[in-house]
From Swiss-Prot:
It comes from Cerastes cerastes. This is Snake venom metalloprotease inhibitor 02A10. Residues 1-23 form the signal peptide. GO terms for biological process: regulation of blood pressure; vasodilation. The keyword Disulfide bond applies. Disulfide bonds join C279-C293.
Amino acid sequence: MSVSRLAASGLLLVSLLALALDGKPVEKWSPWLWPPRPRPPIPPLQQQKWLDPPIPQQQKWLDPPIPQQQKWLDPPIPQQQKWLNPPIPQQQKWLDPPIPQQQKWLNPPIPQQQKWLNPPIPQQQKWLNPPIPQQQKWLNPPIPQQQKWLDPPIPQQQKWLDPPIPQQQKWLDPPIPQQQKWLNPPIPQQQKWLDPPIPQQQKWLDPPIPQQQKWLNPPIPQQQKWQRPLQPEVPSLMELHQERQKQGRMMHHDEDPGDAAEGPRRQKKEPGKPEGNGCFGKKIDRINAGFGCPKLPPSGGH
């Protein structure tokens, strides 16, 4: 009986082992074999995976690779884009690029030995303004040498706008033209530093201030120097309010002052007993709080 059971369990183990292997060869290397056998070789890693991936073939036309000897310079211009900007020669890359032939009429080229400086100023014009080209002399005429430190001369066709001011009147007001003399009459010379006179139709508004008191305050009439000020000295509104508060704190509000015959008398109700109002049960008041009867007590609700 026991032998048959052992045989059955052995057959079961063999069948399970056959199912687990399922035609696979047994591995030759095992970590628990002794002596240890050499492990299988590890496949090499892809080198340069930490760099940029290679550029695909269909995108190599975007930016050409920079040669090793020119990586510190500007990248070379592709062949199909050389019509935009001509290439800069190697010996002039630190200078300004040469000006094309068709643009030399804009700005003349700077000499090679002076490209890093400013163009030289002629010796005889270093303290003056640069000369005006021939084709621009009609814009602004040149200023004569003897008048450069003065005001520029007035052109002939503009002399009718503002007449010149005479030398002896430059510190005064300019003269009034003849056609505008009817607008404002001229002010005499000895009154220009004073106040203008008050017209006749406005003399009833404010009397003129005397000349010797214009820089002072107006004089105080003699009959008011000894009088009291016009506004009487009354306590302020805040002082009156504080006085009423103090009087209210000192009074007994629970007592009736009464009259002269009967004297003060106290209130009828007891201070600790509330007054009944005839309400019973749970009723809702005016604000739906459920605190009692909606009608007010006889005292007014306070």
